[in-house]
Design a protein with these regions (language model features):
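Conserved acidic catalytic loop of the alpha/beta-hydrolase fold
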Residues: 157, 166-184
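Short, surface-exposed "cap/lid" segments of acyl-processing enzymes
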Residues: 71-73, 79-154
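Alpha/beta-hydrolase-fold serine-hydrolase catalytic core, especially in secreted/extracellular enzymes
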Residues: 20-32, 151, 316-322, 328-342, ...
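Catalytic-loop region of hydrolases
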Residues: 30-106
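Alpha/beta-hydrolase-fold enzymes
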Residues: 18-55, 180, 197-309, 436-537
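Short beta-strand/loop motif that positions the catalytic acidic residue
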Residues: 346-348, 352
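Gly/Ala-rich beta-loop-alpha elbow adjacent to hydrolase catalytic centers
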Residues: 188-193, 197
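Small-residue-enriched hydrophobic alpha-helices in membranes
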Residues: 594-752
Length: 752
């Protein structure tokens, strides 16, 4: 009996506790009313403030347009050359960036930087949008910095070729301003500015220094099945004729706002909800960042019809750049990317749905079928992949600027002297116990790992899907010819400056800005109400249940729009492949089974083979001759050949040693680069003969001992020397008639 009573009491106690918890969890009617009133006031105030932010956006848009839409740079600048005054005028200009207060003094002997921003509908400035940006990082390291920007309206006769000629003139101007610089200017091409930088470097290879292509599409057909739907757009629209139609409707001018609209349609959840809801939900902190970005995003620029036709026909749909099919108007110059003599650095991200890694990198297998072919052409290609950042984040993210951009810029001299080949840049956090930490500048360690062409191709799912784009190219050419012959004359006859201006004014990308601005008389009460709201602002607590419900509703809307996007993109891909992978359409446009676009690596001519033969003959004379630097560099390359990794620590240690000994004043970076290339080829051509020739380069015993000791010390900066590398050092010591490195190090320790 007593046991049952105890059980009854315990169960009653548990039930009472549970009921008290429930009563505590359920808010009282008074609390519910308080939360509702508090949330209602806050939601109304946020709505008013959001409308006022949109009004400010409209005013900023109008003010920016009235001022001529200058670059939205965070830095002061001065224009030093105007492309509109050139013999072949272009609406481009070259500006010198004025270092802000607190920045290190610019060193005229350091290599100058030239940033080329994309002309893809928006205005210039994204490359220097913040202090933590490509320009900001360059200025912090003391480099002279220049910016290539453009004006809102193109010159009447402007073409892509005239733009390239203007950029070549800018490059000459920078070189003349820095005659004592340690090497050629470093070119940074952002997004569409990347292919412009490639064309510039291929057209004037003797003038251009290293290139950084940031989020730049070069191989436009590449991608992964189930992703990257933007590449299907040209096919579903029937090719390039629509760009010509838009140019004809614009009275010979293409409106860049159309490109902005296309970008926004790619991500409907952000365009129609997330972007504005983020401002609404964080109305007390977010408007300044939002308005700063919208100033650039809403600055729409124009192109000539001929420029947009060239871009769509040669790049987006034609994909002719990596095929070596781009030629000048007079037919005298062919743009071959293999002509580029300086290192090419590619920065791409897996989170970028506008320029996925395949489109940023597949031009490499388009040009070369093996890394040996890259080496034979004396090219150095480096790529770096981010795991998650989006397209715009590549240019505006402070985290990316402080990590990838800062490390790639800091390692630029090392990249410039890398042996020809293909490398992946791997950037990692340093650890306190990292060997050689004193030779790492900053938080991150960068190393360059040798890669093969197969590693690039492994980033995608094969290239079979690209055959459909061959069909698109043929269909586009047919439709373009039909449009030019039968439709374009009628559209041009119906267009005039007034209709073109009206069409631009009524573009949705512009209407949403000027319609909610002080031009609208209804904006005045919005401003007055918003001023009162700011005075009596009553923000609710984030713990308010209705705020949490609002967030849940927002997430549900985002999921719904993302679901629509996934369905739309899947339907687009299915429709594209249904049309363009059909055998009958391929046959109809003249493509045979298995035919692919001809690539430059399949068209090796007798001239190219003869060039390679003469290069080998030239190298033959260098096995037994050279300077002390040649001998030391050959020793280093021979000993580290099997590692396939180049670390920044040995290079930084070598630079420090050169500064301490005064050799940095005698050996220029360009000299070091040429010696590294030459000795790399000699070791690759005949390793044993290169080793046997070392005694003739390092004649004196003191030079031999010093070169071997320095090479061994440099190798030790990354930690314990690998057995395979130690064996090579011992082999070198034997050839040079010296004691093995390990024994000499032991003897030195004992004597100390």
């Amino acid at each position: 009996m007593s046991r049952s009573v105890v059980c009854f009491v315990r169960s009653s106690s548990n039930r009472s506790c549970s009921m008290s918890d429930v009563n505590h969890a359920v808010p009282s009617p008074v609390q519910c009313a308080h939360d509702a009133i508090e949330y209602g006031i806050d939601a109304w105030q946020r709505s008013v403030l959001l409308l006022d932010v949109l009004r400010e956006r409209g005013n900023i848009y109008l003010d920016h347009a009235r001022s001529g839409q200058p670059p939205v740079l965070a830095f002061e600048y001065e224009v030093i050359m105007d492309g509109r005054a050139l013999p072949q005028p272009a609406n481009y200009a070259l500006a010198r960036i004025v270092p802000p207060d607190g920045s290190p003094e610019t060193d005229p002997k350091k290599r100058p930087f030239i940033v080329i921003d994309p002309r893809a509908g928006h205005g210039p400035g994204i490359g220097g949008f913040k202090m933590d940006s490509e320009i900001g990082i360059a200025l912090k390291q003391g480099h002279p910095c220049y910016f290539v920007f453009f004006f809102p309206h193109p010159e009447p006769s402007q073409t892509i070729e005239s733009v390239t000629r203007a950029e070549i003139a800018f490059l000459e101007c920078v070189a003349q301003r820095h005659p004592d610089a340690e090497d050629k200017p470093f070119l940074i091409g952002n997004c569409q500015g990347g292919w412009a930088a490639l064309i510039l470097a291929a057209a004037a290879p003797e003038m251009a220094g290293p290139l950084l292509l940031a989020g730049s599409p070069v191989s436009y057909w590449a991608g992964v099945a189930g992703k990257n739907p933007m590449r299907y757009t040209g096919g579903l629209l029937g090719g390039t004729w629509l760009a010509s139609f838009a140019g004809d409707c614009g009275n010979g001018t293409f409106d860049g706002a159309n490109l902005v609209n296309n970008f926004e349609q790619m991500n409907p959840s952000n365009t129609y909800w997330t972007k504005l809801y983020n401002v609404y939900a964080n109305i007390d902190t977010e408007p300044a960042r939002f308005l700063e970005f919208e100033r650039w995003w809403g600055g729409h620029f124009l192109m000539n019809k001929e420029e947009m036709e060239w871009i769509t026909q040669n790049l987006f749909v034609g994909n002719r750049l990596s095929a070596g099919e781009v030629v000048s108007a007079d037919g005298r110059t062919r743009i071959d990317l293999r002509n580029i003599r300086s290192p090419i650095v590619v920065f791409a991200s897996w989170g970028d749905n506008i320029t996925p890694p395949q489109q940023a990198l597949y031009w490499i297998p388009d040009l070369y079928d093996s890394v040996d072919a890259i080496r034979c052409n004396e090219q150095t290609i480096v790529y770096c992949l981010n795991d998650r950042i989006g397209h715009l984040g590549i240019f505006v993210s402070a985290g990316v600027a402080k990590k990838e951009h800062a490390e790639l810029i800091s390692a630029l001299d090392l990249i410039d002297v890398l042996p020809p080949g293909l490398y992946e840049a791997v950037i990692e956090d340093t650890q306190p116990d990292l060997p050689g930490l004193e030779f790492v500048a900053g938080r991150y360690l960068i190393r360059f790992e040798a890669r093969e062409i197969s590693d690039i191709l492994a980033l995608g799912d094969g290239r079979e899907g690209e055959r459909a784009f061959e069909v698109v190219k043929r269909v586009a050419e047919i439709n373009q010819g039909a449009y030019d012959k039968f439709v374009s004359p009628w559209v041009r006859a119906a267009s005039n400056p007034w209709t073109a201006a009206w069409a631009r004014l009524m573009n949705p990308a512009r209407v949403e800005r000027w319609a909610i601005s002080n031009l609208n008389p209804w904006a005045l009460p919005v401003k007055l109400t918003a001023d009162a709201v700011r005075t009596w602002r009553q923000a609710t607590s984030p713990e308010n249940p209705l705020v949490k419900s609002e967030n849940q509703v927002s997430r549900a809307i985002v999921r719904g729009l993302e679901g629509y996007q996934a369905w739309r993109d899947g339907a687009v891909e299915i429709l594209f492949r249904t049309i363009y992978e059909s055998p009958w359409l391929a046959s109809l446009v003249g493509l045979k089974e298995g035919s692919v676009q001809r690539r430059t690596n399949e068209t090796a001519s007798w001239f190219e083979e003869e060039f390679k033969r003469l290069k080998r003959l030239e190298l033959e004379t260098w096995f037994e001759k050279g300077t002390l630097l040649d001998g030391a560099m050959r020793l280093i390359i021979y000993c580290g050949r099997d590692l396939r990794v180049v670390d920044e620590r040995p290079f930084n240690a070598m630079r420090e040693l050169m500064r301490e000994s005064g050799l940095d004043a005698q050996i220029r970076l360009s000299d070091l680069k040429q010696v590294t290339k030459r000795q790399t080829f000699l070791v690759l051509l005949d390793e044993e003969r290169a080793l046997a020739g070392l005694p003739k380069l390092l004649v004196r015993e003191s030079d031999r001992r010093r070169a071997l000791d320095v090479a061994y010390a440099l190798a030790a900066t990354v930690g314990e020397i690998a057995p395979v590398e130690r064996a090579r050092f011992d082999r070198v010591a034997e050839v040079l008639d010296l004691a093995p490195c390990a024994r000499r190090a032991t003897e030195a320790t004992e004597s100390a």
